């Protein structure tokens, strides 16, 4: 993602030429916002009276937001864990796949009870709660990384 690299380069320059894994995250702020907007647009326009292309636009925005969020998070994990980045990335992917496997178990009843609009609104609020971790990681990520019992840069 060239735009993410520009954010990273700017923050490295501003930090005296030293990069930090947290500098990969700013693009995720934009991505999580687009993800939430896309899911809300999809949910509230997925009705038979509304032209089919409108919820498709919501899906496209949601997909772009997902990519703009997941790529910086993956780069953050790789930069944070050094030589252990493959294992850490695998752990993140397993978590994503587990969520993807569990969601269909309750999605049908969620949308049947709440309808698409309110069901997607609930999901957007859950995304908002999860998205709050990005600014926390950006601000306190270095202190959080220093809490772990080992330093990957030593190995």
From Swiss-Prot:
A GO cellular component entry from the record: membrane
Tree of life domain: Eukaryota
Keyword Membrane: yes
Membrane-spanning ranges: 25-45, 50-70, 91-111, 118-138
Places the protein is found: Membrane
Keyword Endoplasmic reticulum: no
UniProt keyword terms in alphabetical order: Membrane, Transmembrane, Transmembrane helix, Transport
Record membrane topology: Multi-pass membrane protein
Family statement: Belongs to the major facilitator superfamily. CAR1 family.
Name the record gives this protein: Putative uncharacterized transporter C977.04
Organism in which the protein naturally occurs: Schizosaccharomyces pombe (strain 972 / ATCC 24843) (Fission yeast)
């Amino acid at each position: 993602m060239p735009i993410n690299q520009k954010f990273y380069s700017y923050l490295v320059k501003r930090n005296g030429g030293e990069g930090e894994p947290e500098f990969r995250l700013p693009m995720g702020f934009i991505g999580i916002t687009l993800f939430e907007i896309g899911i809300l647009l999809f949910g509230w326009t997925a009705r038979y009276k509304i032209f089919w292309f409108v919820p498709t636009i919501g899906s496209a925005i949601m997909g772009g937001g997902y990519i703009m969020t997941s790529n910086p998070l993956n780069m953050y994990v790789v930069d944070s864990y050094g030589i252990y980045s493959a294992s850490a990335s695998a752990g993140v992917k397993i978590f994503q796949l587990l969520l993807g496997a569990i969601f269909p178990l309750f999605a049908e009843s969620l949308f049947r009870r709440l309808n698409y609009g309110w069901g997607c609104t609930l999901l957007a609020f859950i995304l908002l709660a999860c998205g709050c971790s990005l600014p926390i990681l950006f601000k306190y990520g270095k202190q959080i990384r220093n809490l772990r019992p080992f330093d990957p840069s030593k190995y």
